[in-house]
Amino acid sequence: MEGYILDWANLLLRWLHVIVAIAWIGSSFYFVWLDNSLTKPTAPDLKDKGVDGELWAVHGGGFYNPQKYLLAPKQLPDHLHWFYWESYSTWMSGFALLTVVYLFNANVYMIDRSVFDMTATTAVLLALGFLVVGWLVYDTICRVFGKNDRVVGILVAIYVVIAAFAACHLFSGRAAFLLIGAMIATIMSANVFFWIIPGQRKVVASLKAGEKPDPIHGKRGKQRSVHNTYFTLPVLFAMLSNHYSMTYAAKYNWAVLVLIMLAGVLIRQFFILKHKGVVNWGYPAAGVAVLLGVAVWLAPVSRPAAPVAEAPAATAPAAAAEGSASAPAAAGQATAAAAGGSDFAKVQAVVTARCYQCHSAHPTLMPSPAKGVLLDTPEELGKHAQLVYQQVVQQKLMPLGNVTQITDDERTIIAKWFEGGAKTN
């Protein structure tokens, strides 16, 4: 029942997170477009009111004329709409989802002992540290070098590269990618919470008090808002990357992450300039070139299957990480015993020894079968043959962190079975 409840929490939080993220990104992209599309007003009355830019647009059968004031209107309207709950709700739902999926299952999803051996508690603390330290470093860079946008951009980019390298050498690949995305998303939402909204509140307070607002608040808010728009596409990739293991499972996965994020920034730059009337196809061309280069770099190389050892070396799997049950002690004997049987019998022995801990009706490493995938019957194993082959043989992602210590010989057993037609009889 606990696993069932967590699955529903995962579903509902993920749904909520996507909905509010669409609202936040949509409003952010709209205002970046609006800011860069404004034209100087020609009507004297608009100039007298302090309007610095305006735009005429048509949408949904109606005409719109948004106007932006150089600093603020002389008199505030009775109702003033604020844009901040989109940001806050996106971060809160995202952190809740991170907690339910990753922090509650650190042994399974965050730790890869072939990368860095640590306890679940250490993994959780390090993950939280990435979020906090990421914001503190970024904010310090902006405070110290804020008057020079180029220097800020270079230093922030360098920090993201360092953070990506560190994360990929501490956590499992999928967790590392997600944490870098969460770190940048935390920076984005913290920009709204600590700088953009407080600055706007100070401007409003000054106007209500009959004082002239300090323009520095608008400048700081605009700078952080611009940073956020460049962060958006890299964060979206990091959040989607968990579905594409060829990226986070690569040998130099940190470089893959950095390069794809760079492609996102280049593509975003094209649209930002286009809003200003400047069309430079070099930016998207460079972004696409980077993506194609990464795709070619990561392309799998077809090799003939190696001959299967007559009696594969199979040792009893090590105990799973802290707080989880150990794999069956007789796993090695079961695998070796199947060495002389049919291809499918050998595969069943390997799956029983190495995969049942997460993919059976009664898993021992988690409350319910991971991703709802069961491998404890011939029918289920045959149905998921393609997935097993991809995850275990081609990408070597499973078992997660190789917690059950599957051997290369055992992976070859699965490869030979699948490439021979994945027969279950």
Labelled PLM ranges:
Residues 2-6, 65-83, 214-218:
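Cytosolic juxtamembrane amphipathic/interface segments immediately preceding
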Residues 15-44, 183-199:
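Hydrophobic alpha-helical membrane-embedded segments
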Residues 28-72:
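Membrane-interface amphipathic/juxtamembrane segments adjacent to transmembrane helices
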Residues 61, 75, 95, 102, ...:
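Aromatic- and Gly/Pro-enriched helix-to-coil junctions and flexible linker segments
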Residues 87-106, 165-178, 231-250:
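Alpha-helical transmembrane segments and their membrane-interface junctions
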Residues 103-217:
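Long, contiguous internal "core" modules enriched in hydrophobic/ aromatic residues
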Residues 133-139, 195, 262-272, 294-299:
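Alpha-helical transmembrane segments
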Residues 147-154, 249-253, 274-289:
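Membrane-interfacial entry segments at the cytosolic side of transmembrane helices
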